[in-house]
Every structure is written in C-alpha cells, then in structure tokens.
From Swiss-Prot:
Its main location: periplasm. Residues 1-20 form the signal peptide. Belongs to the thioredoxin family. DsbA subfamily. PANTHER family: GLUTATHIONE S-TRANSFERASE KAPPA, THIOREDOXIN-LIKE REDUCTASE RV2466C. This is Putative protein-disulfide oxidoreductase RBE_1288. It comes from Rickettsia bellii (strain RML369-C). One of its GO terms (molecular function) is disulfide oxidoreductase activity. It is an enzyme of class 1 (oxidoreductase). Residues 47-251 form the Thioredoxin domain. It is found in: Periplasm. InterPro entries: Thioredoxin-like_fold, Thioredoxin-like_sf, Thioredoxin_CS, Thioredoxin_domain. Its EC number is 1.8.-.-.
Length: 259
C-alpha cells in the first residue's frame, strides 16, 4: 500500500486550487488525489514571498498510477485535531497553523531566524496554540515527515523537526537521503528498525496526505511556509506579518468576551 501512497503524493494538485473566495477553508480530505504536479517553495529576494516549483514525477512513479489504495477520509480543518502536533496552549482560542515542507529552504530560514522570537512571544506565554503541519511534495518530504512523527509525541517531533531542517542541505539533495534520515533518527532515539516500521505505518502516511490535500484548497496557498491564524492566511512569513495577525485575533477574542 505504501507504494500507492508514494505515487499519489507525487500527483498532488496545486494548479487546481479552489477558486472559492472564503479565507477560512474547511473540507474533507481524502487519499484519492487528482493527478498533477506538486509544488514546493523557491528562493526569492526578500525571504518573505512564497513561490512554487513543480516536483518531478519519475518514470517509476508514473508506472504505479493505476494502483489505488483503500480510500479513507479524514476531516481536516484549521482547528486542532487528534493528529496535530501542538505547541503552546491547546485550549487557546487563537490557533496558528504553520504549513511547511522538510525540503523547503524558506522553512529552514523561518525556523532558524523567525520562529524563536515567535515562540518566546506567543507560545511560551501560552497565548496561542501553534500547530505544525507538513506539505508533502516529494519522497524526501514524506520520509522526513514520517521520521519526525515516528514516536508520536510533540517533544520528539520538534527535536527531529529541528535537526531535519538544520541538516536540510545534506540529506534533502542526496540520493542516499533515506540512509541519512536513518542516521538522523538514531540521533533522536529512533532505531533503524523503528524507522522502517514507521515508514510502513499507513496511519502516519494517511495523515500527511490528508493535511496536504486540505491545504491545496486554500485560495491563497502557493507554497511553503504558509501561516493561518484562526483560518485566515497571513500576508507572508515575516515576524511582523504573523505577529500582526495574532495580535488582531487576540484583540478580537477579547472584544467578544467583553460583549
């Protein structure tokens, strides 16, 4: 079944994004993905505008297109669900959802330079619930994301999340990326046997596919990293943009209480 999942992941559709005008998106996400090209972010001059680059569909993947996995439907929204990795206050009325790809250079930049300030200001003070979700565009993204979720707890997830992004330039461009990820796994306490088992865990893969399918329907989503504050997408991933959106949501929440 995993081969079919890999096939479907390479056939993600960004060009067919929803033309709906609502900023808050809620839909049912299925593992059945319409054939098309996937997209990831590309470098730009100001480090705050997302662009996309189509993923390559290899001949080996193309040969598997006819294979169909069992269809299971996940309900994905911009609210917290049982499959989410959450930092901060899970009971907060302010939910920030970050979409990233393990192979995305902008995502690595964000996490090394912007996220620490955001964490100190809003997460450590329990002002928000911060959800990190993956956008899967390549096999490398899939395998790295599975490693990060392998143990299933937020501490392990964030540990691998940090290592994977810091060492992105080493494993993501290597033909031996699986071996390198296996080595990274051992650094974080995941044995090669455990990682192999997680790679065959349909539930993890299904969650990643569902999250990916969901975000492609967001009207303004064009790549990673992308951020949504209570379902409303921020202008970019600068600290000023994200902070402004969070502060606005906090103020609106206070006003509702006052009423």
């Amino acid at each position: 079944m995993r081969n079919s999942f890999i096939t479907l992941i390479f056939l993600l559709l960004l060009s067919g994004c929803s033309e709906e005008k609502e900023k808050v998106v809620e839909q049912e996400s299925s593992e059945s993905i319409t054939p098309a090209q996937a997209s990831t972010s590309d470098e730009n001059n100001n480090q705050t505008t997302e662009t996309t680059t189509p993923a390559v569909i290899t001949p080996a993947v193309q040969e598997q297109i006819e294979q169909k996995p069992e269809v299971k439907t996940f309900k994905v929204t911009f609210k917290i669900d049982e499959n989410d990795m959450v930092l901060g206050n899970k009971d907060s009325k302010i939910v920030v959802v970050e979409y990233f790809s393990p192979t995305c250079p902008h995502c690595a930049y964000y996490h090394s330079t912007i996220f620490p300030e955001l964490k100190q200001k809003y997460i450590d003070t329990n002002k928000i619930a911060y959800v990190t979700r993956e956008f899967i565009a390549t096999k490398q993204d899939l395998d790295a994301s599975i490693l990060a979720r392998c143990k299933g707890d937020i501490n392990s997830f964030m540990l691998f999340h940090d290592i994977i992004l810091k060492q992105q330039d080493k494993w993501s461009v290597s033909n031996k990326y699986r071996e390198l990820l296996t080595d990274i796994g051992q650094l974080g306490g995941v044995t090669p046997e455990e990682y192999k088992k997680c790679l065959s865990d349909d539930k993890i893969t299904e969650t990643l596919i569902a999250n990916t399918n969901f975000i492609t329907k967001a009207p303004k989503f064009i790549g990673t990293p992308s951020f949504f504050v209570n379902g409303v997408q921020t202008e970019n991933y600068s600290i000023n943009s994200i902070s402004a959106a969070i502060d606005k949501a906090i103020e609106e929440s206070k006003n509702k209480i006052d009423l």
